Design a protein with these regions (language model features):
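Short Lys/Arg-enriched alpha/beta "domain-start" segment
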Residues: 1-18
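Short secondary-structure junctions
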Residues: 13-26, 84-86, 94
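Short, structured interface segments
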Residues: 65-79, 139-155
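Short N-terminal "domain-start" leader segments
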Residues: 75-117
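Short aromatic-glycine-(Arg/Gly/Cys) micro-motifs in beta-strand/loop hairpins
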Residues: 107-134, 168
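A short, exposed loop/beta-hairpin motif centered on an aromatic-Gly-Thr core
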Residues: 127-141, 155-157
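Charged/polar low-complexity intrinsically disordered segments, enriched in acidic residues
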Residues: 156-203
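Non-Sec secretion/translocation targeting segments of pathogen effectors
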Residues: 205-208
Length: 208
């Protein structure tokens, strides 16, 4: 997993204008003005190097990198252990991350180091197919939020409060890690089309 993690983390940081360098298999260095000031471990821990210890700019960079490092580690790890989603007419190898309340959360690594894609679907009647895909390019948190709403783990009306967002992530993370339903199931609702980063209506996709 270390190789995939560092590759994706480097890509994400590069998109934000942050340069990285792979020091060795256990350490990804983060550069500021061409000089290493931080490094990230294979378990997403971020350490400040002596060159950045007295720099306010390096300190700000530390906090930005730490947030990205944690998010990338979370989705790379969960995809590594997830089973394939076996559905016919599905051209890409998506991995099944969660299946609850008639909704599916899946993800895949895109080809040619183009990052990760996440999608939520709705099972058709009798679970004979999936449709109405909401696609998210690299935005795992938004995909989890959409899944939580579509599956009924949390209501759409709760999406704008920080406390309610924390509950959304708690409920979804519980399902991803433990499998069974949390003790308290929240009311069902459906999101409108504007919530998806990329939204398109799929033809129905049927299980293999």
């Amino acid at each position: 997993m270390e190789r995939e993690y560092f590759k994706e983390l480097s890509r994400r940081l590069r998109e934000e204008g942050t340069e990285t360098s792979l020091a060795n298999k256990q350490k990804l260095e983060v550069l500021l003005h061409g000089q290493p000031v931080l490094y990230v471990s294979t378990t997403s821990d971020v350490f400040l190097l002596p060159a950045g210890s007295k720099s306010e700019e390096a300190s700000e960079l530390y906090h930005r990198v730490a947030a990205v490092a944690d998010e990338v580690y979370e989705y790379v790890k969960v995809l590594q252990g997830a089973p394939l989603l076996h559905v016919s007419r599905l051209n890409e190898d998506f991995r099944l991350l969660a299946d609850f309340g008639g909704a599916v959360l899946a993800g895949r690594e895109r080809e040619n180091s183009r990052g990760y894609q996440f999608v939520t679907w709705i099972w058709n009647y009798n679970r004979q197919g999936i449709s109405h895909g909401h696609y998210y390019e690299g935005n795992y948190q938004a995909a989890k939020q959409d899944f939580a709403v579509r599956s009924g783990l949390i209501s759409r009306a709760q999406l704008f409060s920080p406390e309610q967002l924390a509950e959304l992530y708690r409920a979804t993370d519980f399902l991803l890690e433990e499998g069974p339903e949390p003790d308290e199931k929240l009311p069902n609702d459906q999101p409108d089309g504007n919530q998806a980063e990329t939204l398109r209506e799929d033809d129905s996709i049927h299980p293999a």
